[in-house]
Amino acid sequence: MPARRPFIGGNFKCNGSLDFIKSHVASIASYKIPESVDVVVAPSFVHLSTAIAANTSKCLKIAAQNVYLEGNGAWTGETSVEMLLDMGLSHVIIGHSERRRIMGETNEQSAKKAKRALDKGMTVIFCTGETLDERKANNTMEVNIAQLEALKKEIGESKKLWENVVIAYEPVWSIGTGVVATPEQAEEVHVGLRKWFAEKVCAEGAQHIRIIYGGSANGSNCEKLGQCPNIDGFLVGGASLKPEFTTMIDILAKTRA
């Protein structure tokens, strides 16, 4: 099995002030980030410029939390891929469960956003996940695969585009609840997603695509989760706003060394 480069992303969501973002990003950037790990943080849109200015590390990338599915135009309140690129951003989170569940974003809309970003050369952190009711109904894989099928419909089997996709499995019932999926539960889904990729996209590529876990991941549980062979890192919410985020970076680097 080829070694997949570990990936950890910090999703700041709708949190922080200008002063906090400046100091927090500067603190992460000043930390000795292992060169073996890809590290990104995603502040809100209004904090992007502050985060970019505070980032002094070549090992830390700044990401956007969302993007619109069209280019520049009459889309009040939206942000285009072109605008993100103009700021020098290389990464964007797409399809987060809060976008899907609260904002009503559909599988098709998430997929179209991802295609536009990928076509322009960005790396997409593409989120999938099931609700508690869907898990109880034994529809976990069906729901997650449907979200990936929508992406496949947009980008096909293009190796060039899929190479810039990081899949983030985030069980909705675990996000912000403090209820984390067990390593066994998370690994089972990651195995299923990798199997789908091997069968529907590319068998060889399935061994290379990174699938990370998101859902109340923190400094206390990331080591056991990271020991699972198919979990390649984390998309971190609340813990990314705390000093423990750098601890998680180190733990991931050592666990996946």
Curated annotation (Swiss-Prot):
<dbReference type="GO" id="GO:0019563">
    <property type="term" value="P:glycerol catabolic process"/>
</dbReference>
<feature type="binding site">
    <location>
        <position position="13"/>
    </location>
    <ligand>
        <name>substrate</name>
    </ligand>
</feature>
<keyword id="KW-0413">Isomerase</keyword>
<dbReference type="GO" id="GO:0006094">
    <property type="term" value="P:gluconeogenesis"/>
</dbReference>
<dbReference type="GO" id="GO:0006096">
    <property type="term" value="P:glycolytic process"/>
</dbReference>
<dbReference type="GO" id="GO:0004807">
    <property type="term" value="F:triose-phosphate isomerase activity"/>
</dbReference>
<feature type="active site" description="Proton acceptor">
    <location>
        <position position="170"/>
    </location>
</feature>
<protein>
    <recommendedName>
        <fullName>Triosephosphate isomerase</fullName>
        <ecNumber>5.3.1.1</ecNumber>
    </recommendedName>
</protein>
<comment type="pathway">
    <text>Carbohydrate degradation; glycolysis; D-glyceraldehyde 3-phosphate from glycerone phosphate: step 1/1.</text>
</comment>
<dbReference type="Pfam" id="PF00121">
    <property type="entry name" value="TIM"/>
</dbReference>
<comment type="subunit">
    <text>Homodimer.</text>
</comment>
<dbReference type="InterPro" id="IPR022896">
    <property type="entry name" value="TrioseP_Isoase_bac/euk"/>
</dbReference>
<dbReference type="GO" id="GO:0046166">
    <property type="term" value="P:glyceraldehyde-3-phosphate biosynthetic process"/>
</dbReference>
<comment type="similarity">
    <text>Belongs to the triosephosphate isomerase family.</text>
</comment>
<feature type="binding site">
    <location>
        <position position="11"/>
    </location>
    <ligand>
        <name>substrate</name>
    </ligand>
</feature>
<feature type="active site" description="Electrophile">
    <location>
        <position position="96"/>
    </location>
</feature>
<dbReference type="InterPro" id="IPR000652">
    <property type="entry name" value="Triosephosphate_isomerase"/>
</dbReference>
<dbReference type="InterPro" id="IPR035990">
    <property type="entry name" value="TIM_sf"/>
</dbReference>
<comment type="pathway">
    <text>Carbohydrate biosynthesis; gluconeogenesis.</text>
</comment>
<dbReference type="InterPro" id="IPR013785">
    <property type="entry name" value="Aldolase_TIM"/>
</dbReference>
<dbReference type="InterPro" id="IPR020861">
    <property type="entry name" value="Triosephosphate_isomerase_AS"/>
</dbReference>
<dbReference type="GO" id="GO:0005829">
    <property type="term" value="C:cytosol"/>
</dbReference>
<keyword id="KW-0312">Gluconeogenesis</keyword>
<keyword id="KW-0324">Glycolysis</keyword>
